[in-house]
Amino acid sequence: GDDSSHWNFDPVGGDNKSTVDDFGFVDALLDNLSSNYQINRDRVYAAGFSNGAAFAFGLACYQSENIAAIVSVSGSMSPTQQEGCNPQHPTPVMSIHGTQDSYFLYQGGYYLSMDAVTNYWTSYNQTQTTQPTETVSYDGLIIEKFSHTQGNNSSKVDHYKINGGYHIWFDIDFNGQSTEDLIWDFVSGFDKNGAL
């Protein structure tokens, strides 16, 4: 196994770095939290960076009964995730990705390209419209926002293409909103039944 910190983004036995059942861990964690605290199980979200982003996609694919919406920062889906993905409800997805990412290549490689990821989720969610691209310049980067809306249960798929961006958690300002503001504004508009 791999002793480095990581999330296994496929079910046990899949394309993982170790045999740890991270999906079982999340399931047990949510059960524990809901037993001990007043949490709304319909409004659980997953956001991650890099391998954590791939795990967020895994949660949407394999454990969607626990997840209302996900966000990927500098991550992608594996081919095994694409093949085995079986969400139980329309799943809003937001991704932020740099075109110069040397680990999860924007144009794809072993992991899916950002176009392939976006196409997978727009097809699954059956989004009907693509909003005009918004373009913002920030700190020498050109940021393009692609928004696919009016999916089943009012789901949507938003993608922020960071032209020239590397494999990092982006500290951006997009029309006055930080990365974290964008993420919260996106996910908090949904529960497992759709738009709020």
Could you describe each region identified by the protein language model?
Residues S102-S113:
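Conserved alpha/beta-hydrolase "acid-adjacent" motif
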Residues N86-S102:
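A structural motif
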Residues S35-T91:
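Primarily recognizes the serine-hydrolase "nucleophile elbow" in alpha/beta-hydrolase
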Residues D31-Q38, A60-A68, T122-Q126, S188-K192:
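Sec-exported extracytoplasmic/periplasmic mature domains
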